[in-house]
Amino acid sequence: MKRPGRWHVRDPEYVLQEQKKGIKPMEANNENPIIQLVGLGKQFQTMNGPVTALEDINLEIRYGEVFGIIGLSGAGKSTLVRCINYLEVPTSGKVVFEGKNLSVMKDREKRLARQSMGMIFQQFNLLSQRNVLQNVCFPLEIAGVSKAEAKKRAEELLTLVGLEVRMKAYPAQLSGGQKQRVAIARAMATNPKVLLCDEATSALDPNTTKSILELLKKINREMGITVIVITHEMAVIEAICDRVAIIDHSHIAEVGNVSDIFSGPKSDIGRQLILGDVAEQNLSFGNSRQIRIIFDGRESSEPVIANMVLACKVPVNIMHADTRDIEGKAMGQMIIQLPEDDTDAGRICNYLKTANVKFEEVR
C-alpha cells in the first residue's frame, strides 16, 4: 500500500500494515512532551479591574495520550484549552509545542503550529449554509488545498467518523451526535497532531456521548493523535483518559493517572468530583464515621465485604456502591457506615489493612 500523503487519513488497514513492519502509532512519551505549559497565567480586564482566570499553570502532556482536564464551572478549564492553541493569548508564562515556545514564534510559524491543533466545541459551530462535505472541506480551502484534494480528504474523514451516507445533508438535518462527528472530521482535516475537545459531549445524551467517546478513543489509538479532553464530568475522564489534571479556582489541584486519582484523590475538589452527590446525600445519616473502600479489579471479583463481616462479626451499613471501567479494568467504590463502638470500628479498619484493601475515612 502506498504511504498516505499529507492530507490522507491513517486508516486502520494502513496502521495494521505498519504494525506488521514493526512501526507503531505515536505513543505516550515521558521524555519529550508534545505540549508544556510553564507558569501559565491569564487575566481578563474588566470595568471592575483585572480578573484572574488562570494562575501559575504547569503541565506536561505527552505524545499520543488522552489527557483530561476537569473542573467545576468557572474553574478556568475552557480558558486553559484556548490558551494552548492561542485562541487566548496568555498574560504570563509560556506554551511550548513540540519544543518551541509559541509566544516567540513568527506569525507564519504560529499559524502552522495552530494548524497542528484541531479543536471541537460543545455547540459544534458548523456552517448552516454548507452541507456536511463542504463543512469538512472549509479548513482545507483556507489552507490552500486544491478542491479535488480537499474533497478526497473530507470523504475519507467522513467515512472514518461513520457519516459517508450523510455527506450531502445540511446541519439542520443532523442529530446532535452526527453534528459532533462532522465537527470531529472538520477538526482533523488539516491532519493535526493534537485534538482539543472543549466540553464536546456536554450537549449530548448518554448513549451518544458514549459513541463519541469511543470515536475519540479510536482516533487516538489508530492514528496516534494526542487528545485533550476538557470536561466537568468525571465519567468522561474515566471512560477515555490516561491521565487527568484537576483545575480549581484557576490553579491545578492535582495531576496523575486516572486510576490513581480515583483510588486516592489528594485534593478536596478531587474527592468532590469523584464522589459527586454521594457525600451530600450521606449527611442525612448523622455524625457517624464513614469510610470509602476502593476496589481495583482484584477486589471487585472477591466478596470483600461478606468476608469482612464474617471475620469481624460486626454488621455494617452500606450507604453507596458503584463500579466503573477505568483504564481497561473494573474499579469500584463503596461507602460504609462504621459501627459506633470504637473497638468494632477498629476491627473493620484493621481487617481491611490486613487484606490490602484501600480505604479512606470520608467523615
Annotate the PLM regions.
Residues 48-51, 102-118, 147-148, 261-265:
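ABC ATPase NBD coupling module
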Residues 100-101, 137, 141, 148-165:
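Conserved ABC ATPase "signature" region
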Residues 169-172, 190, 197:
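Conserved signature/switch motifs of ABC ATPase nucleotide-binding domains
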Residues 255-256, 264:
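ABC ATPase "signature
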